[in-house]
Protein backbone atom coordinates (compact mmCIF):
# COMPACT_ATOMS: atom_id res chain seq x y z
CA UNK A 1 0.00 0.00 0.00
CA UNK A 2 1.10 3.55 -0.71
CA UNK A 3 1.04 5.88 2.29
CA UNK A 4 -0.65 9.28 2.26
CA UNK A 5 2.76 10.83 2.97
CA UNK A 6 4.21 9.18 -0.15
CA UNK A 7 1.29 10.48 -2.23
CA UNK A 8 1.84 13.99 -0.83
CA UNK A 9 5.59 13.77 -1.50
CA UNK A 10 4.95 12.70 -5.10
CA UNK A 11 2.55 15.61 -5.63
CA UNK A 12 5.08 18.02 -4.13
CA UNK A 13 7.87 16.78 -6.43
CA UNK A 14 5.67 17.21 -9.49
CA UNK A 15 4.52 20.65 -8.34
CA UNK A 16 8.04 21.87 -7.55
CA UNK A 17 9.38 20.71 -10.92
CA UNK A 18 6.53 21.49 -13.32
CA UNK A 19 4.24 24.01 -11.59
CA UNK A 20 1.00 22.36 -12.78
CA UNK A 21 -2.36 24.00 -12.35
CA UNK A 22 -3.72 21.03 -10.44
CA UNK A 23 -3.01 17.42 -9.47
CA UNK A 24 -5.99 15.18 -8.80
CA UNK A 25 -5.81 11.76 -7.18
CA UNK A 26 -8.33 9.32 -8.64
CA UNK A 27 -8.93 5.59 -8.68
CA UNK A 28 -8.90 3.32 -5.66
CA UNK A 29 -6.78 5.65 -3.53
CA UNK A 30 -9.33 8.43 -4.01
CA UNK A 31 -12.70 6.72 -4.12
CA UNK A 32 -12.21 3.09 -3.29
CA UNK A 33 -10.37 0.84 -0.97
CA UNK A 34 -6.86 0.32 -2.24
CA UNK A 35 -5.28 -3.05 -1.72
CA UNK A 36 -1.71 -4.30 -2.00
CA UNK A 37 -2.00 -4.48 -5.80
CA UNK A 38 -3.46 -0.99 -6.30
CA UNK A 39 -1.50 1.57 -8.28
CA UNK A 40 -1.55 5.33 -7.86
CA UNK A 41 -3.70 7.22 -10.37
CA UNK A 42 -2.88 10.89 -10.95
CA UNK A 43 -4.54 13.41 -13.25
CA UNK A 44 -2.26 16.40 -13.84
CA UNK A 45 -3.51 19.62 -15.44
CA UNK A 46 -0.73 21.78 -16.87
CA UNK A 47 0.33 23.78 -19.88
CA UNK A 48 2.50 21.81 -22.29
CA UNK A 49 3.34 21.58 -25.96
CA UNK A 50 4.45 17.95 -25.65
CA UNK A 51 2.29 15.04 -26.70
CA UNK A 52 0.31 13.53 -23.78
CA UNK A 53 2.46 10.38 -23.56
CA UNK A 54 5.65 12.47 -23.41
CA UNK A 55 4.14 14.61 -20.65
CA UNK A 56 3.61 11.54 -18.48
CA UNK A 57 7.14 10.33 -19.28
CA UNK A 58 8.52 13.70 -18.10
CA UNK A 59 6.76 13.25 -14.78
CA UNK A 60 8.06 9.69 -14.45
CA UNK A 61 11.62 10.97 -14.94
CA UNK A 62 11.11 13.47 -12.11
CA UNK A 63 9.91 10.65 -9.85
CA UNK A 64 12.66 8.18 -10.79
CA UNK A 65 14.12 8.06 -7.26
CA UNK A 66 11.41 5.89 -5.78
CA UNK A 67 9.29 3.39 -7.64
CA UNK A 68 5.59 3.54 -6.99
CA UNK A 69 3.30 1.83 -9.51
CA UNK A 70 1.23 4.59 -11.07
CA UNK A 71 -0.84 5.72 -14.00
CA UNK A 72 -0.40 9.38 -14.90
CA UNK A 73 -2.76 11.29 -17.17
CA UNK A 74 -1.63 14.77 -18.17
CA UNK A 75 -3.92 17.21 -19.97
CA UNK A 76 -3.66 20.89 -20.76
CA UNK A 77 -6.44 23.19 -19.52
CA UNK A 78 -7.66 23.47 -23.13
CA UNK A 79 -7.75 19.70 -23.59
CA UNK A 80 -9.62 19.37 -20.30
CA UNK A 81 -12.24 21.95 -21.38
CA UNK A 82 -12.71 20.07 -24.64
CA UNK A 83 -13.19 16.72 -22.86
CA UNK A 84 -15.73 18.32 -20.50
CA UNK A 85 -17.58 19.94 -23.42
CA UNK A 86 -17.96 16.63 -25.25
CA UNK A 87 -19.23 15.00 -22.06
CA UNK A 88 -16.34 12.60 -21.38
CA UNK A 89 -17.70 10.50 -18.48
CA UNK A 90 -14.25 9.42 -17.28
CA UNK A 91 -13.00 13.00 -16.99
CA UNK A 92 -16.26 14.05 -15.32
CA UNK A 93 -15.82 11.29 -12.72
CA UNK A 94 -12.23 12.34 -12.00
CA UNK A 95 -13.29 15.97 -11.53
CA UNK A 96 -16.37 15.08 -9.47
CA UNK A 97 -14.98 12.31 -7.26
CA UNK A 98 -11.21 12.74 -7.34
CA UNK A 99 -9.22 14.38 -4.55
CA UNK A 100 -7.29 17.53 -5.37
CA UNK A 101 -3.88 16.94 -3.81
CA UNK A 102 -2.26 20.05 -5.28
CA UNK A 103 -3.66 23.31 -6.64
CA UNK A 104 -1.45 26.17 -7.75
CA UNK A 105 -2.17 29.52 -6.13
CA UNK A 106 -3.72 31.84 -8.68
CA UNK A 107 -2.41 34.94 -6.92
Predicted regions mapped to residue ranges:
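Conserved H-loop
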Residues: 28
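Catalytic core of pol beta-like nucleotidyltransferases
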Residues: 1-22, 31-36, 47-107
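Short hydrophobic/aromatic beta-strand micro-patches
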Residues: 43-45
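Short, conserved active-site loops that position catalytic residues or coordinate cofactors/metal ions
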Residues: 38-40
Amino acid sequence: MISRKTITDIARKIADSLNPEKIILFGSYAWGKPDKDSDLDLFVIMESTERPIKRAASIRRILKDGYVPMDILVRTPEELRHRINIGDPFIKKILRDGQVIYARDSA
